[in-house]
Amino acid sequence: ILRTGFTTTDGKPVQFIREHVPFTLGYTEVAGRMEYEGKKIIDDRIEEIRHYRFDLSAPPLLKAHLVKFENGEGALIINLHHLIADAWSVYLLLKELQLIHDSIVSGNNDVLPKLVSQYTDYTNWLNGMMQTVIFKKKLEYWKTQLAGAPALFSLPTDFARPAVKNFSGSSFSIWLGNDRLVSLKQFAKEREVSLFMVLLTAFKIVLSRYTAQNDIVIGTPVANRVFPGSQDLIGLFINMVAIRSAVNDEMTVSDLLEKIKETTINAYNNQDVPFEKIVESLGVKRDTSCLPIVEVLFSFQNLPVKNRLSGFEYEIIKPASNSSKFDLSCIIEENENGLECMLEYASGLYKPRTIERFFGHFEMILNKIPQIVNDQLVKID
C-alpha cells in the first residue's frame, strides 16, 4: 500500500501500484538539547509535515522527518495520508520500525513477518462480498436498525450552524489514572461487558442529559479487519458503525448498559458493511450543513504499543487538533498510564467552556458508575 497512488479515469478514482517509489527521510541536526532549543524546532517541523499537501498520483503517500539532538535524543515525525492508513496501520508501522531497529542492533536481517495477502486482495474480496446474500442480510440489519433515526443528533450548539459545514476544530483532554482504569475494568468484568461498553454508556448518559433526547445515535470506528491476513496489513480498513440507543428516565444504568452491550455486539457482527453503503440504502437526504446520520463520534483504542527499543526509550506525542470532522468526537486511548481522553469539537459551534463542562460531567459519571449502576437515570445528579 505504501507504493500505491491514485488517479482518475473517466472521472472515477483509480488506484495504481508502482514497482519502486522514491522516499527521502527529512533530517535536521540540532546543536542543543531537546528540552531547551528543541521544542520550537520540533513544533515547526510538525506543522510543516502535518500541512504537507500530498500529490495522490505520486506515492508514497507518507512524509517523515527526523530531528536529532547532540545528546542523542530525537523526534521522528510521520504523516500518513488517510487514504492508505488507519489507527491500526500506525500501530503496525511502529511495530515494524521497532522490529527493524532491533534487528539492526542484533544483526538479524530477516525479521518482518511474511504477508499472506495484500491490500488489493482485500479490495477484490470486498467487491465480491458485496454481491453475496450474506452482505444483503447485513445491509438489511442496518436499514432496520437505523430506520427513523434522527436526521441530526448532536450536542446543542453555542453558535448557529453554518449553511455549509466547515471542519475547523479544537480539542480538550483529561487523564484518568491507572487506579481509575483498574476500577472501571473490574466493574466491566463484574457486569460481563467490555470496557468500551462502560465508557460508551457513561457518554450516552451525559449526552441524554445535555440534549434532552431519548433517541441517541453515535458513530464508532471499528477495525473491520475480518479479511484473512488483514491484521498484518497497512491500509485503510477502518469502518464506522452507528450505535443507536433508546434512553429514557425510567431506565437504570444497568438497563442501558445491557442494551448497549446487545446493540454493540450486533453492530460488530455486521461491521463489514461500508458505512457509505448504509447511508445510500437509507436514502438519507444530503445536507451541506452536517454529515449524514452521525455527527457525534466515540472511539476507544487499546492497541499495545511498547515504548522501549534496544538501547533507548521513546514516547508517542500527538499534536493538538485544529480540525474536527464531526461536531463532537470523544477519543479514548488506553495505555500504561491509564486512559487518555480527548474531546475533539467543532470550534465554530461550541465554546471551550461548554466542552470542558461536558467532559467534566462525563468524568463524574465514570467515577460514580459502579455505585449508581442500579439507579434510574432520572435520579442521577
Name each region found by the language model.
Residues G5-D10, V14, T28-R33, K40, ...:
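Adenylate-forming
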Residues I17-T24:
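Structured interaction and signal-relay segments at domain junctions
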Residues S89:
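Receiver (REC) domain switch/active-site region of two-component response regulators
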Residues V373-D381:
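A Lys/Arg-rich helix-loop hairpin that forms a DNA/phosphate-binding surface
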